UniProtKB/Swiss-Prot annotation:
It comes from Mesocricetus auratus. It is an enzyme of class 3 (hydrolase). Belongs to the FAH family. Keywords: Calcium, Hydrolase, Magnesium, Metal-binding. May have hydrolase activity. Its cofactor is Ca(2+); Mg(2+). This is Fumarylacetoacetate hydrolase domain-containing protein 2A. It comes from the Eukaryota. Its EC number is 3.-.-.-. The keyword Nucleotidyltransferase does not apply. GO terms for molecular function: hydrolase activity; metal ion binding.
Length: 26
């Protein structure tokens, strides 16, 4: 899961956008 390593690298705005992608439960 290389994307998981890039999560903390990208800005918070992107994290919120990727949140539903990494956590489909929510």
């Amino acid at each position: 899961r290389a994307l998981a390593t890039q999560l903390p690298v990208i800005p918070r705005s992107q994290v919120t956008f990727l949140a539903p992608v990494t956590r489909p439960e929510k």
